[in-house]
């Protein structure tokens, strides 16, 4: 009786237009960054050092920048409709801007809250009572922030623009199941509104004063020369992160963007 021939399995061949043919190494894209810090720390000044910026202003932070160095900016926002108009103009109309700066998402939050309260026919006293309460108002605010982030993502991907979100800082209590509660600096936003600017950013930078202590015991005093540092690595003191391997504080010098050295998409671009 003849022994049946053993068939060798055929090696699968990739289809010329199959899904696997689309695989490639992703290219560097423009950065998406959130800058956080107390008032007067230089957030707007640093944002103005990104390549050819255009500012969307929910507040006017330009006065800290000398007039001859001020970047281009849209008129101050007076409604959320104006915000969408300005963002859509950058998406649809021809221009040569390379960075969108939104100053600030904290001020946008106030605008969003005011709109939701004003549009509620029941005339709620606060955002907590808006839209029937039970967190619905705050969820609606978070949805508007998500819309901002989505439009910014289109500019980043389609128009190859860097995106800089500016946020004011506030303290928040962190409660973890395996640690005692502790306080850190975070974004001055509702808890549900934070994710678009932290989870979905390449860099979250916290600007702080460089401080030293003098004296001993109860007589210790914090002193500072006024020098500022940009923190972009994970730390318990403040919300911060980066996807570029930065592991130390970055000194901030006037007129110099300390991130250029670390972010490929910023190098060689004016």
Residue ranges and their predicted role:
Residues 15-18, 23-102, 106-114:
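Conserved P-loop
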Residues 107-193:
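P-loop NTPase motor core
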Residues 172-270:
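Conserved GTP-binding G-domain of TRAFAC-class P-loop NTPases and closely related GTPase folds
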Residues 53-55, 163, 204-206:
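Short, well-ordered beta-strand core segments
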């Amino acid at each position: 009786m003849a022994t049946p021939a053993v068939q060798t399995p055929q090696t699968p061949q990739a289809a010329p237009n199959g899904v696997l043919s689309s695989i490639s190494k992703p290219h560097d894209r423009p950065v998406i960054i959130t800058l956080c810090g107390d008032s007067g720390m230089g957030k707007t000044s640093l944002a103005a050092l990104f390549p050819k910026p255009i500012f969307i202003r929910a507040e006017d932070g330009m006065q800290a920048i000398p007039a001859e160095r001020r970047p281009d900016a849209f008129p101050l926002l007076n409604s959320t409709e104006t915000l969408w108009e300005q963002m859509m103009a950058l998406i649809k109309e021809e221009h040569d801007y390379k960075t969108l700066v939104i100053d600030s998402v904290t001020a946008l939050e106030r605008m969003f809250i005011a709109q939701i309260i004003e549009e509620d026919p029941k005339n709620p006293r606060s955002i907590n009572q808006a839209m029937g309460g039970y967190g619905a108002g705050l969820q609606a605010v978070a949805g508007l922030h998500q819309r901002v982030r989505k439009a910014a993502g289109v500019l980043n991907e389609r128009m190859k623009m860097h995106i800089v979100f500016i946020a004011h800082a506030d303290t928040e209590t962190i409660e973890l199941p395996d640690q005692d509660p502790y306080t850190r600096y975070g974004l001055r936003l509702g808890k549900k509104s934070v994710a678009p600017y932290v989870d979905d950013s390449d860099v979250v930078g916290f600007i702080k004063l460089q401080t030293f202590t003098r004296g001993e015991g109860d007589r210790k005093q914090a002193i500072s020369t006024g020098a500022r540092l940009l923190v972009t690595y994970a730390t318990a003191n403040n919300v911060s992160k980066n996807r570029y391997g930065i592991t130390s504080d970055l000194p901030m010098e006037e007129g110099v963007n300390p991130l250029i050295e670390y972010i490929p998409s910023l190098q060689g671009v004016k």
